[in-house]
Amino acid sequence: MEALVYTFLLVSTLGIIFFAIFFREPPKVPNKKMK
């Protein structure tokens, strides 16, 4: 069960960092192909 907890913590941390960067820097350029 420890692996599941660590995976959840890792995903949540990455999600928080991603949202923080995404919302701090609003996309000015209209996304043509964001991949």
Swiss-Prot record:
Keyword Plastid among UniProt keywords: yes
Keywords from the UniProt entry: Chloroplast, Membrane, Photosynthesis, Photosystem II, Plastid, Thylakoid, Transmembrane, Transmembrane helix
Subcellular location: Plastid, Chloroplast thylakoid membrane
A GO cellular component annotation in the UniProt record: chloroplast thylakoid membrane
Thylakoid is among the record's keywords: yes
Cited InterPro entries: PSII_PsbT (IPR001743), PSII_PsbT_sf (IPR037268)
Cystine connections: none
Cross-referenced Pfam families: PsbT
Primary localization: plastid
Membrane topology: Single-pass membrane protein
GO BP annotations, alphabetical order: photosynthesis
Transmembrane spans: 3-23
Subunit annotation: PSII is composed of 1 copy each of membrane proteins PsbA, PsbB, PsbC, PsbD, PsbE, PsbF, PsbH, PsbI, PsbJ, PsbK, PsbL, PsbM, PsbT, PsbY, PsbZ, Psb30/Ycf12, at least 3 peripheral proteins of the oxygen-evolving complex and a large number of cofactors. It forms dimeric complexes.
Function: Found at the monomer-monomer interface of the photosystem II (PS II) dimer, plays a role in assembly and dimerization of PSII. PSII is a light-driven water plastoquinone oxidoreductase, using light energy to abstract electrons from H(2)O, generating a proton gradient subsequently used for ATP formation.
HAMAP family, alphabetized: PSII_PsbT
Family: Belongs to the PsbT family.
Protein name as it appears in the record: Photosystem II reaction center protein T
Origin organism lineage: Eukaryota, Viridiplantae, Streptophyta, Embryophyta, Tracheophyta
Gene (UniProt): psbT
